[in-house]
Regions:
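Loop-to-transmembrane-helix transition segments
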Residues: 18-24, 65, 70-95, 159-167, ...
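C-terminal transmembrane-helix exit sites in multi-pass transporters
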Residues: 96-98, 115-137, 258-277
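Helix-helix packing/entry segments at the starts of transmembrane helices
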Residues: 109-114, 181-197, 234-265
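Glycine-/small-residue-enriched transmembrane alpha-helix faces in small-molecule transporters
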Residues: 2-48, 154-180
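Transmembrane alpha-helices of multi-pass small-molecule transport proteins
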Residues: 2-4, 19, 43-91, 170-173, ...
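Transmembrane alpha-helical segments that form core, pore/gating elements
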Residues: 46-47, 61, 155-210, 215, ...
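Hydrophobic transmembrane alpha-helices of multi-pass small-molecule transport proteins
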Residues: 134-150, 275-294
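Hydrophobic/small/kink-forming positions within alpha-helical transmembrane segments
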Residues: 27-32, 62, 86-94, 116-121, ...
Length: 299
């Protein structure tokens, strides 16, 4: 799961379909990134895979955006919070990689999508927002969904579940920080710092985790593709907000669950059981309740 940049002003109705399609493509690329991560973690340790993702992402931004936006990439109003936000995302990336190494793609993605529900809890204490009855209903519903997916007898790895929950908590904190910074920071700056801090953190750790083997040509292509999927996915989702309002795009993020299910079936021959699918639907419903609560609060 990934956090899009701050939404742009409300779009014209004629452009909503374009925004919808851009968001759908971005979410597909996020699912492709997770699929590639899962495949590579079967052959390399997780820190190495995550490091390569951030290195490719950072290089792409430097090559494509730095010549035109050099000052905008690095200039911030609240540098400490920007770096903290990026560091939290590196934790989420590590946790999701460890979870994908141990669990099927769809189930990992579903548990990670508990993040929007957790935001309701974080926002209450950090942003002073009222949770309310609908918010608490969403929180409880989301945890019921996780319990159905991770129930005894599900066959899922216990540590994989722990790491997926850790990723959800980190993602929620990351998104709350994004909201705190939205009023003062440019989307392109926040995106660059996530790539830069991830590259620094995992790049420095890489000598301790690097495995003494040379990647094959297909693996090199996958490493490059993984970073490209993430960077391009963020770009398309950010672009979608120019054409469609947040009220349309926010519920759409759950389309990534569908993409994850399809790719998990096509690539890894893995399909969730009936209880797992039920849990995924319930988690999606909890997130939609949060979106509804947010919309009602604005009116």
């Amino acid at each position: 799961m990934n956090d899009p940049a701050s939404p742009q002003p409300t779009a014209l109705p004629t452009n909503v379909l374009k925004g919808f399609l851009l968001a759908a493509a971005g979410l597909l690329l996020f699912a492709c990134m997770d699929s590639t991560t899962k495949y590579l973690t079967a052959h390399y340790n997780v820190p190495t895979v995550v490091a390569m993702r951030y290195i490719v992402h950072c290089l792409l931004m430097l090559v494509i955006l730095a010549p035109r936006h050099s000052n905008k990439l690095i200039t911030t109003q609240r540098t400490g919070l920007v770096i903290l936000r990026a560091a939290v995302l590196t934790m989420a990336s590590l946790f999701i990689g460890l979870a994908l190494q141990r669990m099927p793609l769809a189930e990992t993605t579903a548990i990670n999508f508990l993040a929007p529900t957790l935001i309701a809890l974080f926002a209450g204490s950090l942003l002073g927002e009222q949770i309310g009855g609908l918010g608490w209903a969403a929180v409880i519903t989301g945890f019921i969904g996780v319990l159905l997916i991770a129930r005894p007898g599900s066959g899922l790895d216990a540590w994989g579940i722990v790491f997926a929950l850790g990723a959800a908590v980190a993602n929620a904190a990351y998104q709350v920080l994004s909201r705190l910074l939205a009023s003062t920071e440019r989307a392109i700056t926040l995106l660059f710092y996530t790539a830069l801090i991830g590259t620094i953190v995992f790049g420095l750790a890489l000598p301790w985790f690097w495995e003494n083997k040379t990647p094959s040509t297909p693996e090199i292509i996958l490493f490059i593709g993984m970073g490209t999927f993430g960077g391009l996915g963020h770009y398309l989702f950010t672009l979608a907000y120019r054409y469609a309002p947040a009220s349309v795009l926010a519920p759409m993020t759950y389309l990534q669950l569908l993409w994850a299910g399809l790719l998990g079936w096509i690539i890894f021959d893995s399909t969730p059981d009936t209880w797992g699918i039920t849990g995924m639907v319930i988690i999606a419903a909890s997130g939609l309740l949060i979106a509804l609560k947010s919309r009602l609060n604005k009116h």
